[in-house]
Regions:
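Amphipathic alpha-helical segments that line or abut small-molecule/effector binding pockets
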Residues: 16-19, 126, 130
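A short, structured loop/turn motif at beta-sheet edges
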Residues: 12-16, 65-70, 89-98
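Beta-strand/loop substructures that line and gate deep hydrophobic ligand-binding cavities in soluble
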Residues: 78-127, 134
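Hydrophobic ligand-binding cavity/cleft-lining segments
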Residues: 1-39
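Glycine-rich portal/gate segments that line the openings of hydrophobic small-molecule binding cavities
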Residues: 30, 39-85, 108, 130-141
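Short beta-strand element of the conserved SAM-dependent methyltransferase core
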Residues: 9-11, 52, 75, 90
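Residues at beta-strand starts and edge strands
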Residues: 3-5, 58, 71, 84, ...
Length: 141
């Protein structure tokens, strides 16, 4: 079973400005209000793990499963019998940058975790992406 949610924003920020914020894992709470703290346990590269503590809920471990500098990255958390992928992508054109965040949940218990965590993620994702875009433009998140 699979569940996903998606949000995007167009910003005047350069891709490297967004990338800098994404790769500053300890600073994720600056643009994501659901994050109390986060840290990466090594370089921003495929296979590196990290820890994220949400404002509500248990601390979760994640691993970077895809890193394409200035273009995209994915961090994956494990769920019982499943996975939770946070997919971040940049697209450029017409003098702007499109910041996309997609969250995909997979596994036989998705029906349960969709209700427990998915609904909150879907609710907050548009504001998270908007704050990231404003911060990348040099504004206040």
């Amino acid at each position: 079973m699979t569940w996903s949610t998606y949000s995007a924003t167009r910003t005047r920020a350069r891709p490297e400005d967004v990338w800098r914020l994404w790769t500053d894992v300890a600073g994720w709470s600056r643009w994501d209000d659901d994050v109390a703290s986060s840290q990466l346990e090594g370089p921003f590269a495929v296979g590196t793990g990290g820890v994220l503590t949400p404002r509500s809920g248990p601390t979760i471990r994640f691993v970077l499963t895809h890193v394409e500098p200035m273009v995209a990255f994915t961090n994956r958390a494990s769920l019982p019998l499943g996975t939770l992928d946070f997919i971040h992508t940049l697209r450029t054109g017409s003098g702007s940058t499109v910041v996309e965040h997609r969250v995909e949940m997979k596994g036989p218990l998705t029906f349960l975790f969709r209700r427990l965590v998915g609904a909150g993620i879907a609710r907050s994702l548009p504001a998270v992406v908007e704050r990231l875009g404003r911060l990348a433009e040099g504004g206040v998140p």
